[in-house]
């Protein structure tokens, strides 16, 4: 229990009560069940003070309002009834705030999410700052839940049903101007005058009722509502493939509230919250949330990180440009790019310009902020400006002698403490460091494409990499907004190693006659964001298959792909989306056109293209190989823990989050079931499915990857 209250009441001389929210000992405000008594005590004082003109809720934290409710509360619930009770308690508290007899204003700066936004919705008006840190949303769906403290009922009545459905079903976060346009907030002001603006609004005796736009009023009526909900159900089912029960319950609860009234809506919301909290999907999604939070706190090693004030990048291509952007614009670090010609430097600069200009157009940042961030990036065709760089990231071609040459040049032109980080996806870091004068300062830092979107990076120390080099590189990755996992220096590292057999099997099924769209649809239905064939097209067929010979040389035949198929496709100049033709055909750039499977692909690989396997059989063949390889990586200590393996797969390749990652999924299936399934597939399709020793041992001992002490709760 906290001894200091998280909610402090101060009555100003002008008779406006200011309630400051400041959870003791925490960087971020989150709502906990034990705060209810504190809030009620303050509400009692407010009701008893007849001289009060209004109330303002504001955060005392530097950059957040309330980031949500403490998710650990849900994990403590033993059954659906306890979770439902938790929701009803939240609903009651919000109702008491809404029922205050004077104007109540939420003054919002920073993150206002989940339970924080539900509290703001219970206030009579909302004002927020124009700061980039200010975002408002209800992200509970991302944890397999719905808003449980009245959010499903208040939001549709405030912003309209279609806007509310979009926000709650996606968990999207609105920036200040978007929130103002939607009617979620009443005003947007600079942070310096937030409190005074809120106080002035609180002093107004009568707050005008906001009128919904005509479109929203039509959709709220019986006919418009019926049409809207029918369309939303259909679209949501297509998107979720039935894997996320929370989305269907969200639609039901919002519809109930609009059709039968708020009281029925609140009842439905609390019941749905309780039931969803007990679903395996919500438990898995919460586990992913806690695991990712832990990974972000993990320093990578016990050593303190070295200096990290500026970064160099070798290569201005697609990866180099993306790395420059996340380093400068996310991390706030000065970046110097070296390329063999000015064209490469200009490409990297344009990469950042385009991303920042899009933000300016969408009014996410001001032009002055764009210029400030761009000023952090500079370039050169030689090593001028590199002498003081603390870390240099190499993003040149996958050529070992070239990368070794880069190491030598950096050691010659940079400081003695400078770290050399290679963005290789396939070459051993130990080989890259083989001729280094300071091998302890050489490390792998594997980004995924597109760099600005993919959240994961693999940090790969080789045998001689120092603990400080690891810590410094992990620190950089976090500054870049990435989630880093430390993996061993073995062929394919972790993510590409478990991805390769999955894609290989999809190609193998193509050679057996299965249709491209059938294979992709089967894996999307299983829960992946895109199918394996489409993924190969997106990555680039030439790029995606380059690692297969490396893995086959290291691990043997289980990594062999139908070589003639890959060769035939590449020889036909099919690289995927980047050149407009792969397994799919793509329209002209800039034109919206649906991708279509190229029927010529079947003739090219010598098959008819007639599917014989069920979607479940297709998914099983691909996924079981991925799981088996993940278990091998665990056994060989390629990954440090099941936690890192789950996060790597979910964030790196889109492994279905509602399954919790490959290791939680294998635990759910049970090692005995895993071994039996792999043995059955091995009998049908060959020894590549033979269960690895790790799984066989675990089946014999009835062990799990996640130990009993590791729950779906945070520490």
From Swiss-Prot:
InterPro entries attached to this UniProt entry: 3-OHacyl-CoA_DH_CS (IPR006180), 3-OHacyl-CoA_DH_NAD-bd (IPR006176), 3HC_DH_C (IPR006108), 6-PGluconate_DH-like_C_sf (IPR008927), ClpP/crotonase-like_dom_sf (IPR029045), Enoyl-CoA_hydra/iso (IPR001753), FA_oxidation_alpha_subunit (IPR050136), FadJ (IPR012802)
A molecular-function term among this protein's GO annotations: long-chain-3-hydroxyacyl-CoA dehydrogenase activity
Compartment annotation: Cytoplasm
Stretch list, region 3-hydroxyacyl-CoA dehydrogenase: 306-715
GO CC aspect terms: cytoplasm
Function: Catalyzes the formation of a hydroxyacyl-CoA by addition of water on enoyl-CoA. Also exhibits 3-hydroxyacyl-CoA epimerase and 3-hydroxyacyl-CoA dehydrogenase activities.
Family: In the N-terminal section; belongs to the enoyl-CoA hydratase/isomerase family.
Subunit structure: Heterotetramer of two alpha chains (FadJ) and two beta chains (FadI).
Protein name as catalogued: Fatty acid oxidation complex subunit alpha
GN (gene name): fadJ
């Amino acid at each position: 229990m906290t001894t200091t209250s998280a909610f402090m009441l101060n009555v100003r001389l002008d008779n406006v009560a200011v309630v400051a929210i400041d959870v003791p000992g925490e960087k971020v405000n989150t709502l906990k069940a034990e705060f209810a008594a504190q809030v009620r005590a303050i509400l009692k004082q407010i009701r008893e003070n007849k001289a009060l003109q209004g109330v303002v809720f504001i955060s005392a934290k530097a950059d957040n309002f309330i980031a949500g409710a403490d998710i650990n509360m849900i994990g403590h619930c033993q059954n659906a009834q306890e979770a439902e009770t938790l929701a009803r308690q939240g609903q009651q508290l919000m109702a008491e705030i809404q029922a205050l007899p004077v104007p109540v204003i939420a003054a919002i700066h920073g993150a206002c999410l989940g339970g924080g936004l539900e509290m703001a919705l219970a206030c009579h008006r909302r004002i927020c700052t124009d700061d980039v840190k200010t975002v408002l949303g209800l992200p509970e769906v991302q944890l397999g839940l719905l808003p449980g403290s009245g959010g499903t009922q208040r939001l549709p009545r405030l912003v309209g049903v279609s806007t509310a459905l979009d926000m709650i079903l996606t968990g999207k976060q609105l920036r200040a101007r978007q929130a103002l346009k939607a009617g979620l907030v009443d005003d947007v002001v600079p942070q310096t005058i937030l409190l005074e603006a809120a106080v002035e609004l609180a002093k107004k005796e009568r707050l005008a009722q906001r009128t919904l736009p005509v479109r929203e009023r039509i959709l709220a009526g019986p006919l418009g509502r019926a049409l809207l909900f029918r369309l939303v159900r259909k679209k949501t089912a297509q998107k979720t493939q039935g894997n996320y029960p929370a989305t269907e319950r969200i639609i039901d609860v919002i519809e109930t509230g609009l059709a039968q009234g708020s009281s029925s809506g609140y009842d439905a919301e609390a019941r749905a919250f309780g039931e969803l909290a007990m679903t395996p999907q919500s438990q898995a999604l919460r586990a992913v949330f806690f695991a990712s939070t832990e990974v972000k706190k993990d320093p990578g090693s016990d050593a303190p990180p070295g200096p990290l004030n500026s970064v160099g990048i070798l290569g201005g291509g697609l990866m180099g440009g993306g790395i420059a952007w996340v380093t400068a614009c996310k991390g706030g670090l000065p970046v110097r790019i070296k390329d063999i010609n000015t064209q490469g430097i200009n490409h990297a600069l344009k990469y950042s310009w385009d991303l920042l200009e899009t933000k300016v157009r969408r009014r996410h940042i001001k032009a002055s902020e764009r210029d400030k961030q761009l000023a952090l990036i500079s370039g050169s065709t030689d090593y001028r400006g590199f002498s003081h760089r603390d870390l240099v990231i190499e993003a040149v071609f996958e050529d070992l002698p070239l990368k070794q040459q880069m190491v030598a040049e950096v050691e010659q032109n940079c400081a003695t403490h400078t770290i050399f980080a290679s963005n290789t996806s396939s070459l051993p870091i130990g080989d890259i460091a083989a001729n280094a004068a300071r091998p302890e300062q050489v490390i792998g830092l594997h980004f995924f494409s597109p760099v600005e979107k993919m959240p994961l990076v693999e940090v790969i120390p080789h045998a001689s990499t120092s603990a400080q080099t690891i810590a410094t590189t992990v620190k950089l990755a976090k500054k870049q907004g990435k989630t880093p996992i430390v993996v061993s220096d073995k062929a394919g590292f972790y993510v590409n190693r478990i991805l390769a057999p999955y894609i290989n099997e999809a190609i193998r099924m193509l050679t057996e006659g299965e249709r491209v769209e059938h294979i992709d649809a089967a894996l999307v239905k299983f829960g992946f964001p895109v199918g394996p064939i489409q993924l190969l097209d997106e990555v680039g067929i030439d790029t995606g298959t380059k690692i297969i010979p490396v893995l086959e040389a290291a691990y043997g035949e289980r990594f062999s792909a139908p070589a003639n198929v890959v060769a035939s496709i590449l020889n036909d100049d099919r690289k995927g989306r980047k050149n407009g033709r792969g397994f799919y055909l793509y329209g002209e750039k800039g034109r919206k056109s649906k991708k279509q499977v190229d029927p010529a692909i079947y003739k090219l690989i010598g098959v008819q293209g007639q599917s014989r396997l069920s979607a479940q059989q297709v998914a099983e063949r691909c996924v079981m190989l991925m799981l088996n390889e993940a278990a091998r990586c665990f056994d060989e200590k390629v990954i440090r823990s099941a936690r890192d393996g789950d996060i790597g797969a979910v964030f790196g390749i889109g492994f279905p989050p509602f399954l919790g990652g490959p290791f939680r999924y294998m635990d759910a299936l049970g090692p005995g079931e895993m071994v039996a399934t792999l043995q059955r597939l091995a009998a049908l399709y060959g020894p590549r499915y033979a269960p690895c020793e790790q799984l066989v041992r675990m089946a014999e001992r009835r062990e799990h990857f996640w130990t009993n002490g590791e729950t779906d709760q945070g520490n």
